[in-house]
Structures are given as structure tokens and as C-alpha cells.
Amino acid sequence: MTPHTKEKLHGDLPSASSKAASADRKELAAIAFERTRMPMVVTDGRKPDLPIVLANKAFLELTGYPAQEVLGRNCRFLQGPATSPIAVAEIRAAIAGEREVSVEILNYKKSGEQFWNRLHLSPVHGDDGKILYFFGSQIDMTEYRRIEALEASEHRLLMEVDHRSKNVLAIVDSIVRLSNADDPALYAAAIQHRVQALARAHTLLAARGWTNISLEELIRQQVTPFAATRAIFNGPDINMPAPVVQPLALVLHELAVNAAHHGALAVAQGRLSISWKPRPSGAGFYIRWQEVGAPTPPKLAKRGFGTVIVGAMVEKQLKGRLQKIWSDEGLLIDIEIPSAGPTCA
């Protein structure tokens, strides 16, 4: 509704006189205002605080206020702690300029419940162009907002699933490419065991909601089946980001398999000690894998495929560092893992 324009209803009502028709039209307009399902209010634009002078049934039902608690008050009683000051300022500017405005604003019902309100405010001017009233209609957008948020959440979930799937596929691709294919039966068994290690890690991730994964829990999960009571675990509570878990699970699996077949766990007197600690920066962690009593490999021993996979997971997937040292006591492996997750490239 523009200034200096007096809106009229289109059409006419049959009546014995123009005066009666005018009265009928006013009565019909009042009935329509009251019975429409759209919440509506009218405020007095000539008074200082723009008090509400009319409020229909739909408005009272939406807000939960009785008529006596609405009439005579400014509409700001619907505002609350989380109402946007920007939206409020936009409404005030439109009132000051006597112009139409549509604003989506967070309002509060009498019960304290929040609802999203799409407010359309229109000025009503007299024949002389002066402001008489402001007419406000509302649409409850709460359910729409809820659905919108669900759709956004679903989209984020799909993106996260896509990202996680790419990470897992990258790891599986590494397993397939780096496993020894000389003997088909051994090749199939090695891949199966490595994928099972990933599956156990995935189960742990799912159980923890893909957040706050305990480093100790992962280490014990992957190592205990091979070490039983012959492993010592020592370190503080450290939680890992989810992208680190599956590549690290494969690293631990390979180290445990090697220890069981060729290292300290392959001999009666051998012992395995695994310790961990946070990096000085607080981001990421160190793992020390120590095998005491492990047989020293021949100097010209061929680099095993498990070693290749461990190196690929630590250095390429996790962007970490690995150092292996043989001594008279046995094998010492130091692993450094930064906080960032793996890449899929």
C-alpha cells in the first residue's frame, strides 16, 4: 500500500441503499479480518507507541495471548533474547519511513516457545496522506525453518558420508595395490585381514558417533588379538579426530601382524610395549612401538609389504613421520601423527 492511496475493496454488494451497502461492506471486511486463518493485527499509527487496536483470532491462537493482553500494547512484547536486532531495526526503519516491509523475525509466544514469523507490515494513510494505521500480517515459518534445517543437515551428512567413503576407498586401494600378489591365496587372505582391521575401526567409529575416538581404545582393539597378555600399554587419555582412525588402525594391524609372525610375539621370551603421548603443540601425538627380544632380521632382508603399507599410511595418508631403529634389545618404532586427517588425492 503506497502513501496517499486509499485502498478499496473490489466489487460491490447488492443493497437497498448506498449507505446500507457501505455498512455491509464494512461488516464483511470485519468478518473476513476476524475469520481468516492468517494472523493479523492493526496498530494505531497516530499514537506514540503504535498500540495494537485490532487483533484477529488467528493472531491470538498463534501467540497464545488473550485479547486483553494484546490490545493497547506495542508488538515488541513478542520479541525475546534471541530476536535479531537487525530485523527489529529493519521494522523500525520501515515504520519511520511509513513504507511496506517484509521481515522474517524470531518471536516468542506467551509460553516462551520461539516461532519464526514472516511479518508483512503495511501503512494505511488517510485521504490527506497522513498515517492512520499500520496493518501487520504474519505467517508462521517455524515448520518451514525446521524442514529447511533438516534438509541442510541431510546435505551435510551426505557430504560427510561422501568424504568418509573416499577416505576408506583410498585406504582400500592402497591395501590392494601394496599387498603381495605373488601367491593368490596369501594375497586374498592378507587383503581380507586388512579389510577386517578397517571394519573393526569402523565399528569403533560408529559406536562413538565419529567423534572423540580414544587412541588407547584403538590400539588395544587392533593389538590385543595378537598379543593377548604379552603387551604393555601406557599413555594418557588422547582423543583423535575421526579421519585419523582407519589409516592408523591399519598401521597398528600391520605392526601387530609382523610382531606375531616375525617379531617379539613370535618368540617365547619376546615382549611388546606400546606407549603414547601428545605432541608439545597439543595437536597430534606420538606412538612408541617397542619389541624386546625380537629376532634381528638379516641385513639384506627384503622390505616386506607390511612395512610398505605402514610407511604409506603414516607418511602419505596421515602426513606423519615414522622412524624404525634396530638394536641389540630389539625393534623400536617411533610414529608421529599430526592432528590433520588423511587426504583422498
Swiss-Prot record:
Instruction: Kindly state which reaction or reactions the protein catalyses.
Output: ATP + protein L-histidine = ADP + protein N-phospho-L-histidine
> What keywords appear on the UniProt entry?
ATP-binding, Chromophore, Flavoprotein, FMN, Kinase, Nucleotide-binding, Phosphoprotein, Photoreceptor protein, Plasmid, Receptor, Sensory transduction, Transferase
Which Gene Ontology terms cover its molecular function?
ATP binding; photoreceptor activity; protein histidine kinase activity
Keyword Membrane set for record = no
Record field: compositional bias (Basic and acidic residues): 1-11
Q: Please give the residue positions where the record annotates the modification S-4a-FMN cysteine.
A: 75
Q: Where does the record locate the signal sequence feature?
A: none
Modified residues annotated as Phosphohistidine in this record: 163
Effect the entry attributes to changing residue 75 to A: Lack of activity
Locate the transmembrane regions by residue number: none
Which parts of the sequence belong to the PAS domain? 25-98
Q: How is it modified after translation?
A: FMN binds covalently to cysteine after exposure to blue light.
> Does the keyword RNA-binding feature in the UniProt annotation?
no
Q: What class of enzyme is it?
A: transferase
SUPFAM superfamilies to which the protein is assigned, alphabetical: PYP-like sensor domain (PAS domain)
Q: Per its UniProt record, what Pfam families does this chain match?
A: HWE_HK, PAS_9
UniProt note: phenotype after gene disruption: Mutant produces similar amounts of exopolysaccharides and shows no significant differences in the biofilm biomass between light and dark conditions. Mutant also forms a higher number of white nodules compared with the wild-type, independently of the illumination conditions.
Coiled-coil stretches: none
The record ties this protein, via NCBIfam families, to: PRK13559.1 (NF010077), sensory_box (TIGR00229)
Q: What is this protein called?
A: Blue-light-activated histidine kinase
